[in-house]
């Protein structure tokens, strides 16, 4: 029984000596007792490979490479004790999550954070630390004379620690307890009796691991432990470390602990001191290892190879940023492979900040076609299988809600194509299908159009497949306490999950994905797909082992399972032999390598900052230590540990060490270099540096062609913008053009150089086929065309539209307002009532009567779908009620009467269309729907006023009219005036007029002249008032009515305006202001009749110009811009047009702001031939039009179903399908 120490600094051959001794033993005694090489878990694969490929070892017939965990398995397999189910790290976190939920009321310190994400992780780490350092719950409870917070913490941790052990019971075991169990059974393990054991690759051991070593001392013939330690420290026997020696702090402490164990066991102790370094082939690397931590500084004096091209073997790579840094490393790796014949496995890349570099390394190395292996555990929370588990449970929990259900369906495990799932999703979104609508055998038939029967049948087939697969899972885990059904246990839920996975053939899918990854050369992905099934099943097994018989609701189960799956990580072994190893500096074992790249040498990263995470802070750990509770070292010891990590990284390379660091972060802010760089420059004055940037021009620095493609695209863009290519890039371009078969992306990039992001014109025959010889269009279409011709083409030519969604949008609310106001007016007319006659209570009652049936028809009864929408319905009714109160005030103050409601004009409609002749015998016909036309007879004159309801504040200006951005009111007025005789005849206006002061009703409307009285936007809004004083209800009502302002233009005729508001001088309804002399104030929204005529002429001019442009095929990407407003602000087609104002061919149409005076000057200066006079018909057309008006103009109740009528808020009356 003996313990032997192999002690030496980095590169002195400790691991080599261990392998040589194992080789010698196996050669001398081929059939002797086992030769065990005990190494860190991460190094087992690497050491097995080393032994297997060592030509002297003869393989590993006697030798066994074990980690402490594998050693435990071997012991249990020989002597028993390993039959219990193992609850791993994931399982413990799930158990702790459950304990926190169950005992939250018993906790004080941890109560508030019990449900906080990550709390179970912190507690699991704390309890694991207690077990590893062999601290019992009783020891925690026994702490006295500490502050109250620390005492409460330790008592609560002791409670949770004990409850966790109880949860594990006798049926399961915690891996953190295994080494204690292993130590107790080692004496019974035959394979360890008389065995020789080498322990290599450790700088320190936990108390549990020391316990195992102590147990092996009693059975093994000899234990050899290699330690990375300067032999001079042991020879000197110094009790304290000198400056620079702190990096050996942990190995020195470990050595002392092992010596104490050996002496206690009365084992003999011997030493092998290795003082000569054998690893380093460059004098600089050898000097660096010996003197990096030596004080005073030992400057490199040169050496035997000082005349060689690179006597140091060390180079610094400052870089512009992280991407430039990794790009430079990738180029150097390819150069080493190309020029020096290096294999990929000769090179390693390490960093202290692997998460910060991982994504960039993956992108850049893939682009350079550098095979690499990322040595870290992969989190798999975003894997489709885990998403399936969590979304399936959430789907049942939320009763088949849309969002979790379609997350579940999009995992690709259901036997439905992506296209079928997408179509199903669109359908469900459009009609608000969720919950009970999925269940049962009732088919869906929400499409109102019978032409969709075939598509509906396909959707129902897909729904049935999903329901048949998913409903057994729903029924199995859904508790039914109201029906007296049994509660559901964790085991039952888990069994149902497993059965769902089998029904969906998840293992087969994963196997297919693994094979596909393997076939495309992604071996790491193939490994992951092969491992994920077993990992998930292990999590479910651990859940059952720990909580199987516990009754649990789905929300708690989902929370616990989520906490477990979030911590699920998979460790992969290198899938290929010749790969660049990419790893983190703090791994337990970083292997020796020929060439090493150390990335991220910045302050705060190298060395890393000591971690303050955990249940206990540094001060609390010191207090616990004073009470005899020894935990993992923190603070100062972590600083020593960081120095050791740096030492390890600097001494891994045999031939070449590259150290790189970015000078700026992603936002261009400067970064400070690491103290390591300053130290290196002190030791090696004149250390070579090479600055890395993304704009390299030296041919020797060119990367792999695939990695050049982004830079190639950038240079082509510069070429397109007028710059010239350097000779190097001219040569690169010629080479790429000769290799288009190997690089198909080049053709696309070159095409982009020639292509312009612009659309010309459709061929005229195609435009006429698309829009028709008689171009039937609407105001909203022409306004869109004025904003951007391409947007008009996308919406009305290509007929693109956004996905329908089952929600109440602003257009839906506008539709509701229009419908209620229409039916309210019809109800008044049928009851012989006037708008101004009803009291507030009576109008509210009538609004309710008219709104209820409309709410049933809107968006598949969306207003009745839940409590929120039912409340919103009440608010919408209040808004409409306020609108009718304001309209009632208009009626009380004036003599204008509603003539017709929702009057359609267009081909085959009540009123004729606005028709404009175009060139080539073509014509434009404008159609639409006018919300409300009011009329008044003043003397022998008839005046018409247009109202258009808006569910928002709307304004109209001459500037907008001039540019065609807002033509709605003007077009409606023009249509009403053209069909005025039809309106007057059908409405009986002349006979039913209230008259006005000084006027009488006309006896013969045929002899009356019809004039425009104005056009107005009426906002259907419920204003919110602010007042510093308390208002009585009557005053509040008046103020709220005054707050609703109509916007538009009115006729500049005092008699006409008095007919609208008899209190004109103090008008709150029209926004008209008068001077003391009774004149109109400047800025009042009034126009003369001649100006209304000019507006109508301008409309005709605009319609003609727009019609000609449409039929000429104008689909140009030319959005307007005026001030801060552009056509692109709320455009849905930006992903389609790719408009980019920075491209030379993409420019806004900058529209000047036209002031009112300039507007009239421009309109009046136009050639009169451009404005053909258009007179209203002098005689009433035939009875067909009159009957059509009586049928469609608003005299009958609304039909059975509401149909959204487009951008005009029920403006067009039917779909804008282009041509007649």
Curated annotation (Swiss-Prot):
Record's compositionally biased regions (Basic and acidic residues): 1211-1220
EC number: 3.1.-.-
Positions that bind ATP: 8-15
Tree of life domain: Bacteria
Entry keywords, A to Z: 4Fe-4S, ATP-binding, DNA damage, DNA repair, DNA-binding, Exonuclease, Helicase, Hydrolase, Iron, Iron-sulfur, Metal-binding, Nuclease, Nucleotide-binding
Binding-site residues, [4Fe-4S] cluster: 788, 1128, 1131, 1137
Gene3D superfamilies: P-loop containing nucleotide triphosphate hydrolases (3.40.50.300)
Positions of the UniProt region annotated as Disordered: 989-1008, 1162-1220
Domain UvrD-like helicase C-terminal: 283-590
The protein's required cofactors: Mg(2+); [4Fe-4S] cluster
GO biological process, one term: double-strand break repair via homologous recombination
Compositional bias (Polar residues): 1162-1171
Cofactor binding note of this UniProt entry: Binds 1 [4Fe-4S] cluster.
Top-level EC class: hydrolase
Misc note: Despite having conserved helicase domains, this subunit does not have helicase activity.
Self-association and partners: Heterodimer of AddA and AddB.
Entry's family note: Belongs to the helicase family. AddB/RexB type 1 subfamily.
Role of this protein: The heterodimer acts as both an ATP-dependent DNA helicase and an ATP-dependent, dual-direction single-stranded exonuclease. Recognizes the chi site generating a DNA molecule suitable for the initiation of homologous recombination. The AddB subunit has 5' -> 3' nuclease activity but not helicase activity.
Name of the featured protein: ATP-dependent helicase/deoxyribonuclease subunit B
Organism classification: Bacteria, Bacillati, Bacillota, Clostridia, Eubacteriales
């Amino acid at each position: 029984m003996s313990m032997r120490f192999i002690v030496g600094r980095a590169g002195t051959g400790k691991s080599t000596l261990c392998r040589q001794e194992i080789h010698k033993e196996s050669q001398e005694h081929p059939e002797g007792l086992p030769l065990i090489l005990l190494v860190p878990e991460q190094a087992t694969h690497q050491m097995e490979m080393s032994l297997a490929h060592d030509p002297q070892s003869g393989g590993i017939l006697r030798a066994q490479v074990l980690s402490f965990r594998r050693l435990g398995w071997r012991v249990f397999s020989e002597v028993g004790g390993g039959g219990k189910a193992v609850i791993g790290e994931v399982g413990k976190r799930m158990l702790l999550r459950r304990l926190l939920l169950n005992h939250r009321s018993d906790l004080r310190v941890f109560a508030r954070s019990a449900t906080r994400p990550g709390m179970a992780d912190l507690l699991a780490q704390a309890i694991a630390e207690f077990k590893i350092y062999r601290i019992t719950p009783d020891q925690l409870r026994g702490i006295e004379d500490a502050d109250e917070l620390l005492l409460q913490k330790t008592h609560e941790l002791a409670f949770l620690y004990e409850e966790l052990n109880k949860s594990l019971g006798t049926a399961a075991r915690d891996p953190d307890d295994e080494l204690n169990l292993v130590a107790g059974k080692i004496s019974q393990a035959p394979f360890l009796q008389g065995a020789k054991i080498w322990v290599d690759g450790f700088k320190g051991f936990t108390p549990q691991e020391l316990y195992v070593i102590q147990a092996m001392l009693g059975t093994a013939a000899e234990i050899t432990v290699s330690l990375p330690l300067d032999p001079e420290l042991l020879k000197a026997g110094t009790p304290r470390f000198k400056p620079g020696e702190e990096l050996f702090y942990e190995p020195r402490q470990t050595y002392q602990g092992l010596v104490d164990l050996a002496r206690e066991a009365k084992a003999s102790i011997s030493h092998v001191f290795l003082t000569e370094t054998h690893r380093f082939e460059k004098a600089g690397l050898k000097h660096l290892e010996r003197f990096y931590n030596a004080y005073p500084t030992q400057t490199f004096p040169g050496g035997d190879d000082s005349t060689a091209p690179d006597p140091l073997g060390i180079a610094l790579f400052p870089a512009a940023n992280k991407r430039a840094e990794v790009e430079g490393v990738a180029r150097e790796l390819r150069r080493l492979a190309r020029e020096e014949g290096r294999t990929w496995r000769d090179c390693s890349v390490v960093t202290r900040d692997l998460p910060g570099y991982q994504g960039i390394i993956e992108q850049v190395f893939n682009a350079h076609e550098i095979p690499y292996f990322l040595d870290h555990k992969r989190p798999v929370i975003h894997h489709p299988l885990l998403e399936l588990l969590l979304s399936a449970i959430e789907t049942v929990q939320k009763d088949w809600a849309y969002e979790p259900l379609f997350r579940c369906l999009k995992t690709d495990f259901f036997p439905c194509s992506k296209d079928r799932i997408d179509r199903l999703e669109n359908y469900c979104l459009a009609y608000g299908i969720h919950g009970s609508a999925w269940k049962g055998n009732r088919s869906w038939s929400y499409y109102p159009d019978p032409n969709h029967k075939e598509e509906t049948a396909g959707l129902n087939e897909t729904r049935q497949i999903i329901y048949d697969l998913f409903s057994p899972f729903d029924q199995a885990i859904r508790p039914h306490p109201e029906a007296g059904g049994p509660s559901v246990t964790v085991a039952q839920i888990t069994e149902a999950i497993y059965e769902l996975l089998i029904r969906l053939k998840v293992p087969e899918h994963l196997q297919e994905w693994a094979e596909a990854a393997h076939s495309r050369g992604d071996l790491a992905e193939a490994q992951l797909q092969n491992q994920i099934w077993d990992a998930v099943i292990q999590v479910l097994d651990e859940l059952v082992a720990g909580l199987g018989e516990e009754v649990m609701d789905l929300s708690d189960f989902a929370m616990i399972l989520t906490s477990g799956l979030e911590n699920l990580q998979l460790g992969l072994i290198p899938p290929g032999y010749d790969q660049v190893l990419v790893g983190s500096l703090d791994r337990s074992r970083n292997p020796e390598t020929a060439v090493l790249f150390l990335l991220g040498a910045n302050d705060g990263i190298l060395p890393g900052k000591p971690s303050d995470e955990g249940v206990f802070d540094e001060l609390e750990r010191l207090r616990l230590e004073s009470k005899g509770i020894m935990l993992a070292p923190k603070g100062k010891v972590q600083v020593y540990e960081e120095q050791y990590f740096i030492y390890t990284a600097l001494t891994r390379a045999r031939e070449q060490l590259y150290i790189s660091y970015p000078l700026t972060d992603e936002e261009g802010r400067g970064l400070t270099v690491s103290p390591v760089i300053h130290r290196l420059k002190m030791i090696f004055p004149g250390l070579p540096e090479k600055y890395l940037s993304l704009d390299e021009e030296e041919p020797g620095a060119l990367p792999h062609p695939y990695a050049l493609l982004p830079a190639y695209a950038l240079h082509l863009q510069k070429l397109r913008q007028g710059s010239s290519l350097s000779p190097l890039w001219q040569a690169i371009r010629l080479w790429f053009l000769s290799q288009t078969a190997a690089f198909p992306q080049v053709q696309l990039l070159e095409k982009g150089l020639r292509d312009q992001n612009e659309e010309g014109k459709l061929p005229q025959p195609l435009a006429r086929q698309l829009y028709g010889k008689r171009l039937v269009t609407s105001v909203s279409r022409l306004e869109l065309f004025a904003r951007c011709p391409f947007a008009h083409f996308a919406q009305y030519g290509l007929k693109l539209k956004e996905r329908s969604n089952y929600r109440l949008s602003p257009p839906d609310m506008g539709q509701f307002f229009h419908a209620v106001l229409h039916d309210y007016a019809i109800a008044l007319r049928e009851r012989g009532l006037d708008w101004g006659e009803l009291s507030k209570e009576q109008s509210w009652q009538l609004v309710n009567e008219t709104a209820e049936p409309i709410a049933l028809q809107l968006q598949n009864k969306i207003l009745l779908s839940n409590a929120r929408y039912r409340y919103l319905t009440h608010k919408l009714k209040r808004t409409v009620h306020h609108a009718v109160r304001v309209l009632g005030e208009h009626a009380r103050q004036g003599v204008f009467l509603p003539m017709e409601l929702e009057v359609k004009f267009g081909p085959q409609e009540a009123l004729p269309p606005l028709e404009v002749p175009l060139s080539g015998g073509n014509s434009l016909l404008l159609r639409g729907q006018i919300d409300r036309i009011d009329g008044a007879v003043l003397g022998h004159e008839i005046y018409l006023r247009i109202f258009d309801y808006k569910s928002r504040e709307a304004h109209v200006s001459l500037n907008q009219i001039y540019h065609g951005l807002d033509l709605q009111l003007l077009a409606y007025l023009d249509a009403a005036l053209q069909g005025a005789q039809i309106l007057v005849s059908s409405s009986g206006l002349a006979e039913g007029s209230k008259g006005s002061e000084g006027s009488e009703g006309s006896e013969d409307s045929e002899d009356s002249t019809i004039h425009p009285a104005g056009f107005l936007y009426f906002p259907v809004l419920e204003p919110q008032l602010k007042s510093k004083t308390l208002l009585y209800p009557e005053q509040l009502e008046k103020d709220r009515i005054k707050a609703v302002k109509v916007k538009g233009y009115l006729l500049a005729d005092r008699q006409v305006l008095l007919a609208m508001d008899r209190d004109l001088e103090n008008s709150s309804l029209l926004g008209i202001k008068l001077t003391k002399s009774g004149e109109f104030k400047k800025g009042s929204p009034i126009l003369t009749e001649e100006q209304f005529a000019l507006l109508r002429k301008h409309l005709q001019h605009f319609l003609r110009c727009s019609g000609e442009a449409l039929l000429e095929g104008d689909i140009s990407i030319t959005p307007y811009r005026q001030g801060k407003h552009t056509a692109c602000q709320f455009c849905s087609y930006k992903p389609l047009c790719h408009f980019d104002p920075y491209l030379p061919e993409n420019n806004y149409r900058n529209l000047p702001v036209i002031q009112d005076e300039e507007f009239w000057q421009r309109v009046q200066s136009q050639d009169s031939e451009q404005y053909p006079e258009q007179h209203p018909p002098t005689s009433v057309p035939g009875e067909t039009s009159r009957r059509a008006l009586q049928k469609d103009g608003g005299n009958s109740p609304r039909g059975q179903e509401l149909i959204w009528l487009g951008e005009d808020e029920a403006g067009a009356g039917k779909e804008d399908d282009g041509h007649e």
